[in-house]
Protein backbone atom coordinates (compact mmCIF):
# COMPACT_ATOMS: atom_id res chain seq x y z
CA UNK A 1 0.00 0.00 0.00
CA UNK A 2 2.78 2.43 0.94
CA UNK A 3 4.50 1.64 -2.36
CA UNK A 4 1.35 2.31 -4.35
CA UNK A 5 0.67 -1.37 -4.97
CA UNK A 6 -2.87 -2.79 -4.84
CA UNK A 7 -4.03 -4.38 -1.59
CA UNK A 8 -6.95 -6.77 -1.21
CA UNK A 9 -8.81 -6.30 2.06
CA UNK A 10 -10.05 -9.53 3.61
CA UNK A 11 -12.17 -9.77 6.71
CA UNK A 12 -15.12 -11.19 8.58
CA UNK A 13 -18.65 -9.98 9.29
CA UNK A 14 -21.71 -10.76 11.41
CA UNK A 15 -19.53 -11.52 14.44
CA UNK A 16 -21.71 -13.30 16.99
CA UNK A 17 -21.04 -14.45 20.55
CA UNK A 18 -23.13 -17.39 21.75
CA UNK A 19 -23.33 -18.74 25.27
CA UNK A 20 -25.69 -20.28 27.83
CA UNK A 21 -27.61 -16.99 28.05
CA UNK A 22 -28.25 -16.60 24.32
CA UNK A 23 -26.60 -15.19 21.20
CA UNK A 24 -25.51 -11.62 20.53
CA UNK A 25 -24.50 -10.19 17.18
CA UNK A 26 -21.98 -7.62 18.36
CA UNK A 27 -21.62 -4.01 17.27
CA UNK A 28 -18.84 -1.42 17.47
CA UNK A 29 -16.04 -3.98 17.64
CA UNK A 30 -12.86 -1.97 18.26
CA UNK A 31 -9.51 -2.74 16.62
CA UNK A 32 -6.58 -2.37 19.00
CA UNK A 33 -3.64 -0.08 18.28
CA UNK A 34 -0.33 -1.94 18.74
CA UNK A 35 2.38 -0.07 20.68
CA UNK A 36 5.07 -2.77 20.78
CA UNK A 37 8.74 -2.62 20.01
CA UNK A 38 9.53 -4.98 17.17
CA UNK A 39 7.02 -7.36 15.63
CA UNK A 40 4.13 -7.03 18.04
CA UNK A 41 1.75 -9.75 19.22
CA UNK A 42 1.65 -11.74 15.97
CA UNK A 43 -1.97 -10.92 15.16
CA UNK A 44 -4.41 -8.05 14.81
CA UNK A 45 -6.59 -7.78 17.93
CA UNK A 46 -10.19 -6.62 18.33
CA UNK A 47 -12.28 -6.24 21.47
CA UNK A 48 -15.89 -5.51 22.39
CA UNK A 49 -18.20 -5.29 25.38
CA UNK A 50 -21.69 -6.74 25.51
CA UNK A 51 -23.72 -3.64 24.66
CA UNK A 52 -27.14 -5.25 24.86
CA UNK A 53 -29.71 -6.42 24.30
CA UNK A 54 -28.26 -9.47 26.10
CA UNK A 55 -25.15 -10.81 27.80
CA UNK A 56 -24.75 -14.15 26.00
CA UNK A 57 -23.20 -15.77 29.08
CA UNK A 58 -25.54 -14.65 31.88
CA UNK A 59 -28.58 -13.71 29.80
CA UNK A 60 -28.71 -10.35 31.60
CA UNK A 61 -29.63 -7.10 29.85
CA UNK A 62 -27.22 -4.74 31.67
CA UNK A 63 -29.92 -2.55 33.24
CA UNK A 64 -29.14 -2.77 36.99
CA UNK A 65 -26.79 -4.37 39.52
CA UNK A 66 -29.03 -7.42 39.64
CA UNK A 67 -29.12 -7.56 35.84
CA UNK A 68 -25.51 -6.54 35.14
CA UNK A 69 -23.32 -7.74 32.29
CA UNK A 70 -19.72 -8.85 32.55
CA UNK A 71 -16.78 -9.75 30.33
CA UNK A 72 -15.12 -8.81 27.08
CA UNK A 73 -15.18 -10.49 23.69
CA UNK A 74 -11.75 -10.61 22.05
CA UNK A 75 -10.85 -11.63 18.50
CA UNK A 76 -7.56 -12.05 16.69
CA UNK A 77 -6.84 -12.19 12.98
CA UNK A 78 -3.62 -13.90 11.96
CA UNK A 79 -2.19 -13.76 8.45
CA UNK A 80 -4.54 -10.87 7.59
CA UNK A 81 -3.17 -10.43 4.06
CA UNK A 82 -3.38 -14.12 3.18
CA UNK A 83 -6.10 -15.54 0.98
CA UNK A 84 -7.68 -17.21 4.02
CA UNK A 85 -6.80 -15.32 7.24
CA UNK A 86 -7.55 -17.02 10.55
CA UNK A 87 -10.10 -15.58 12.99
CA UNK A 88 -9.97 -16.71 16.62
CA UNK A 89 -12.14 -15.80 19.61
CA UNK A 90 -11.58 -15.62 23.37
CA UNK A 91 -13.93 -14.67 26.20
CA UNK A 92 -12.46 -12.76 29.15
CA UNK A 93 -15.15 -13.20 31.77
CA UNK A 94 -13.41 -11.81 34.84
CA UNK A 95 -13.97 -8.08 34.32
CA UNK A 96 -15.98 -5.93 36.68
CA UNK A 97 -19.74 -6.05 36.15
CA UNK A 98 -21.21 -3.19 34.13
CA UNK A 99 -24.62 -1.61 33.51
CA UNK A 100 -26.04 1.19 31.38
CA UNK A 101 -25.25 4.49 33.10
CA UNK A 102 -27.76 7.27 33.77
CA UNK A 103 -27.25 10.57 31.94
CA UNK A 104 -24.84 12.99 33.60
CA UNK A 105 -25.61 16.26 35.40
CA UNK A 106 -24.23 19.70 34.61
CA UNK A 107 -24.59 23.06 36.36
CA UNK A 108 -27.95 23.92 34.79
CA UNK A 109 -29.75 20.57 34.63
CA UNK A 110 -29.97 17.05 36.02
CA UNK A 111 -29.45 13.84 34.00
CA UNK A 112 -29.25 15.87 30.80
CA UNK A 113 -25.83 15.00 29.29
CA UNK A 114 -25.46 11.74 27.39
CA UNK A 115 -23.02 9.47 29.23
CA UNK A 116 -22.76 6.96 26.36
CA UNK A 117 -23.77 3.32 26.41
CA UNK A 118 -21.60 0.27 27.03
CA UNK A 119 -19.50 0.48 23.88
CA UNK A 120 -15.75 1.06 24.03
CA UNK A 121 -15.59 4.54 22.53
CA UNK A 122 -11.81 5.10 22.45
CA UNK A 123 -9.33 2.93 20.56
CA UNK A 124 -8.00 0.07 22.74
CA UNK A 125 -4.23 -0.40 22.95
CA UNK A 126 -2.02 -3.51 22.90
CA UNK A 127 1.45 -3.36 24.45
CA UNK A 128 3.78 -6.19 25.50
CA UNK A 129 1.05 -8.81 25.43
CA UNK A 130 -1.49 -6.72 27.34
CA UNK A 131 -4.67 -5.26 25.88
CA UNK A 132 -6.10 -2.10 27.49
CA UNK A 133 -9.71 -0.89 27.14
CA UNK A 134 -12.18 1.27 29.09
CA UNK A 135 -15.89 2.03 28.85
CA UNK A 136 -18.76 3.62 30.79
CA UNK A 137 -20.98 2.00 33.40
CA UNK A 138 -23.45 2.98 36.05
CA UNK A 139 -21.58 2.79 39.38
CA UNK A 140 -23.03 3.02 42.88
CA UNK A 141 -20.73 5.41 44.77
CA UNK A 142 -22.46 4.86 48.11
CA UNK A 143 -25.05 7.60 47.74
CA UNK A 144 -26.33 7.16 44.18
CA UNK A 145 -25.65 5.52 40.83
CA UNK A 146 -23.47 7.77 38.69
CA UNK A 147 -21.77 7.48 35.29
CA UNK A 148 -18.29 6.06 35.80
CA UNK A 149 -15.59 4.05 34.08
CA UNK A 150 -14.74 0.37 33.93
CA UNK A 151 -11.16 -0.21 32.80
CA UNK A 152 -9.53 -3.51 31.95
CA UNK A 153 -6.02 -4.80 31.31
CA UNK A 154 -6.12 -8.18 29.60
CA UNK A 155 -3.31 -10.65 29.07
CA UNK A 156 -3.68 -11.91 25.50
CA UNK A 157 -1.74 -14.86 24.08
CA UNK A 158 -1.67 -15.94 20.47
CA UNK A 159 -1.54 -19.73 20.49
CA UNK A 160 -0.40 -22.23 17.88
CA UNK A 161 -2.41 -22.42 14.67
CA UNK A 162 -3.95 -18.99 15.29
CA UNK A 163 -5.62 -19.76 18.63
CA UNK A 164 -6.29 -17.03 21.20
CA UNK A 165 -6.43 -16.80 25.00
CA UNK A 166 -7.46 -13.71 27.00
CA UNK A 167 -7.99 -13.01 30.70
CA UNK A 168 -8.10 -9.86 32.80
CA UNK A 169 -5.06 -9.37 35.03
CA UNK A 170 -5.96 -5.89 36.29
CA UNK A 171 -9.13 -3.85 36.17
CA UNK A 172 -11.51 -1.87 38.32
CA UNK A 173 -14.07 0.91 38.52
CA UNK A 174 -13.09 4.58 38.42
CA UNK A 175 -15.61 7.12 39.67
CA UNK A 176 -16.10 10.13 41.92
CA UNK A 177 -18.50 10.89 44.77
CA UNK A 178 -21.65 12.99 44.82
CA UNK A 179 -23.32 13.38 41.44
CA UNK A 180 -19.98 13.67 39.58
CA UNK A 181 -19.82 11.83 36.26
CA UNK A 182 -16.65 10.36 34.73
CA UNK A 183 -17.23 9.60 31.04
CA UNK A 184 -15.52 8.92 27.70
CA UNK A 185 -12.20 7.45 28.91
CA UNK A 186 -9.17 6.81 26.71
CA UNK A 187 -6.14 4.82 27.90
CA UNK A 188 -2.46 4.71 26.94
CA UNK A 189 0.35 2.72 28.62
CA UNK A 190 3.87 4.13 28.75
CA UNK A 191 7.25 2.42 28.48
CA UNK A 192 7.51 2.07 32.28
CA UNK A 193 4.23 0.22 32.76
CA UNK A 194 2.21 3.23 33.93
CA UNK A 195 -1.21 3.85 32.44
CA UNK A 196 -2.58 7.27 31.44
CA UNK A 197 -6.31 7.95 31.23
CA UNK A 198 -7.92 11.08 29.81
CA UNK A 199 -11.64 11.55 30.48
CA UNK A 200 -14.49 14.05 30.73
CA UNK A 201 -15.95 15.17 34.05
CA UNK A 202 -19.19 17.01 34.79
CA UNK A 203 -21.55 17.52 37.73
CA UNK A 204 -24.12 19.90 39.19
CA UNK A 205 -21.24 22.20 40.17
CA UNK A 206 -18.82 21.57 37.27
CA UNK A 207 -19.35 22.39 33.61
CA UNK A 208 -18.11 19.60 31.29
CA UNK A 209 -14.29 19.55 31.45
CA UNK A 210 -11.23 17.49 30.50
CA UNK A 211 -9.13 15.73 33.14
CA UNK A 212 -6.17 13.36 33.04
CA UNK A 213 -4.95 10.82 35.59
CA UNK A 214 -2.29 8.12 35.79
CA UNK A 215 -2.26 4.65 37.28
CA UNK A 216 0.82 3.92 39.34
CA UNK A 217 0.68 0.26 40.37
CA UNK A 218 -2.62 -1.55 40.56
CA UNK A 219 -5.23 1.17 40.20
CA UNK A 220 -6.10 4.78 39.44
CA UNK A 221 -6.19 6.43 42.86
CA UNK A 222 -6.51 10.16 42.20
CA UNK A 223 -8.96 12.49 40.46
CA UNK A 224 -6.05 13.58 38.30
CA UNK A 225 -5.28 17.02 37.01
CA UNK A 226 -7.58 19.50 35.33
CA UNK A 227 -6.53 19.88 31.69
CA UNK A 228 -9.26 22.19 30.41
CA UNK A 229 -12.11 23.59 32.49
CA UNK A 230 -15.57 23.90 31.07
CA UNK A 231 -16.23 27.53 30.17
CA UNK A 232 -20.03 27.41 30.31
CA UNK A 233 -22.92 24.96 30.59
CA UNK A 234 -23.42 22.87 27.49
CA UNK A 235 -26.37 24.09 25.37
CA UNK A 236 -28.37 25.29 28.40
CA UNK A 237 -31.40 26.28 26.35
CA UNK A 238 -31.76 22.68 25.13
CA UNK A 239 -30.21 20.24 27.60
CA UNK A 240 -32.68 19.25 30.29
CA UNK A 241 -35.59 21.16 28.76
CA UNK A 242 -38.62 18.89 29.10
CA UNK A 243 -36.24 16.12 30.07
CA UNK A 244 -34.15 16.33 26.88
CA UNK A 245 -30.77 14.55 27.05
CA UNK A 246 -28.08 16.20 24.90
CA UNK A 247 -25.65 14.08 22.95
CA UNK A 248 -22.12 14.68 24.17
CA UNK A 249 -19.17 14.30 21.85
CA UNK A 250 -18.71 10.53 21.70
CA UNK A 251 -14.96 10.26 22.20
CA UNK A 252 -11.68 10.95 23.88
CA UNK A 253 -8.43 9.81 22.29
CA UNK A 254 -4.77 9.07 23.03
CA UNK A 255 -1.69 8.47 20.89
CA UNK A 256 1.83 7.40 21.86
CA UNK A 257 4.74 9.39 20.43
CA UNK A 258 7.36 6.67 20.77
CA UNK A 259 9.61 4.95 23.27
CA UNK A 260 12.39 7.55 23.11
CA UNK A 261 10.18 10.46 24.12
CA UNK A 262 7.64 8.53 26.28
CA UNK A 263 5.11 11.24 25.39
CA UNK A 264 1.34 10.75 25.12
CA UNK A 265 -0.85 13.02 23.01
CA UNK A 266 -4.52 13.22 23.95
CA UNK A 267 -7.85 14.76 23.00
CA UNK A 268 -10.78 15.43 25.30
CA UNK A 269 -14.09 17.26 25.26
CA UNK A 270 -15.24 20.34 27.15
CA UNK A 271 -18.03 22.92 27.00
CA UNK A 272 -16.59 26.08 25.48
CA UNK A 273 -17.92 29.62 25.71
CA UNK A 274 -21.59 30.30 25.22
CA UNK A 275 -20.95 32.44 22.12
CA UNK A 276 -20.75 29.21 20.11
CA UNK A 277 -24.17 28.00 18.97
CA UNK A 278 -23.32 24.41 19.88
CA UNK A 279 -20.70 25.05 22.50
CA UNK A 280 -18.90 21.73 22.44
CA UNK A 281 -15.14 21.85 22.05
CA UNK A 282 -12.15 19.52 21.71
CA UNK A 283 -8.95 20.16 23.66
CA UNK A 284 -5.66 18.68 22.44
CA UNK A 285 -2.55 18.26 24.55
CA UNK A 286 0.42 16.13 25.39
CA UNK A 287 1.99 14.82 28.57
CA UNK A 288 5.60 13.71 28.99
CA UNK A 289 5.88 10.75 31.33
CA UNK A 290 8.87 10.48 33.66
CA UNK A 291 7.74 7.29 35.37
What positions do the PLM features span?
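C-terminal PAP-associated
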Residues: 1-291
